[in-house]
């Protein structure tokens, strides 16, 4: 059977292209760190924006970790929000100085699809880089939730998100 040189070139080209695509896919990291600055007087914004993502992540076999400052998540809210109660873990009463360290350790394990932590202070460049590396290593998402009072919104980001405090008990 006769095949032209053109056919050989195109098949070797597609083979090379598939190798490049495979290598670039293997090198692509899927981790993400995002900071959500929210106003305390706009409770529905966080629910509208974050809940669909958290619901989708809840379909994975991995856990969702919530590192909350003081409040405890309400079972009723978790269930009503469409989040999988059996995959949501919470650690509360965590001091801010331990939140970043705990997030890094949790993200790095790969056991969590998402790790959510509350911080009032800005991250240092080093902390942010450490979180990004951990999220990439664990193929996970991390959300830094940063509350801002309504009066201070003029000096900060104008749009914001919030998981409302009445969702806790």
UniProtKB/Swiss-Prot annotation:
PANTHER family: BLR3025 PROTEIN-RELATED, CELL DIVISION INHIBITOR SULA. Component of the SOS system and an inhibitor of cell division. Accumulation of SulA causes rapid cessation of cell division and the appearance of long, non-septate filaments. In the presence of GTP, binds a polymerization-competent form of FtsZ in a 1:1 ratio, thus inhibiting FtsZ polymerization and therefore preventing it from participating in the assembly of the Z ring. This mechanism prevents the premature segregation of damaged DNA to daughter cells during cell division. Keywords: Cell cycle, Cell division, DNA damage, Septation, SOS response. Coiled coil: none annotated. It comes from the Bacteria. This is Cell division inhibitor SulA. Interacts with FtsZ. It comes from Shigella flexneri. Residues 162-169 are annotated as: Lon protease binding. Gene3D superfamilies: P-loop containing nucleotide triphosphate hydrolases (3.40.50.300). InterPro entries: Cell_div_suppressor_SulA, P-loop_NTPase, SulA_CellDiv_inhibitor, SulA_enterobact. Residues 106-112 are annotated as: FtsZ binding. Induction: By DNA damage, as part of the SOS response. It holds the Pfam family SulA. Belongs to the SulA family. The record marks 169 as: Essential for degradation by Lon protease. Is rapidly cleaved and degraded by the Lon protease once DNA damage is repaired. GO terms for biological process: division septum assembly; DNA repair; negative regulation of cell division; SOS response.
